[in-house]
Amino acid sequence: YFLGAIPEEFGWTSTLTEPLTKEYGPIKAGIIIGGVWGVWHVIPWSWVHPVGWIAGMCLLNVLMRTAMIYAYVYGGKSLFTGLVFHTMINVTMGIFLNYGSHINTWIFSVWMAIILLSLIYFIKRESKASKC
């Protein structure tokens, strides 16, 4: 699970995150990288999952990548944050039969959106408080 995350995170985190975050900010960078990340996995997912599951997982990838970008930016800009996050995703999916075939990716996306919006809210609130 960890070894599989290494080459991807060298691309997503080490190569793309910094320039795209500087150019577009963390949310737009998350949409761009997360969208590409989702499309990157469509073919292997299509071997065992229906279209609705795949669409939900692509949305989930955008949300997770955005959270990963915030973790990267506020976690010391370390590749390790992306590797740990990606490994946790791989392990979580791997414990389910057929790589998560029994989970509802749309419900997971809603929960991830709530978590992400909370994270952004607290970061912005903390940022405003530290300026005072």
Regions found by a protein language model. Give the residues of each.
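Membrane-interface helix/loop boundary segments of multi-pass membrane proteins
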Residues: 7-33, 70-78
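Hydrophobic transmembrane alpha-helices of multi-pass small-molecule transporters
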Residues: 41, 45, 65, 90-94, ...
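Functionally important transmembrane alpha-helices
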Residues: 54-109
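Short, Lys/Arg-enriched, Gly/Pro-containing loop segments at transmembrane-helix junctions
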Residues: 128-132
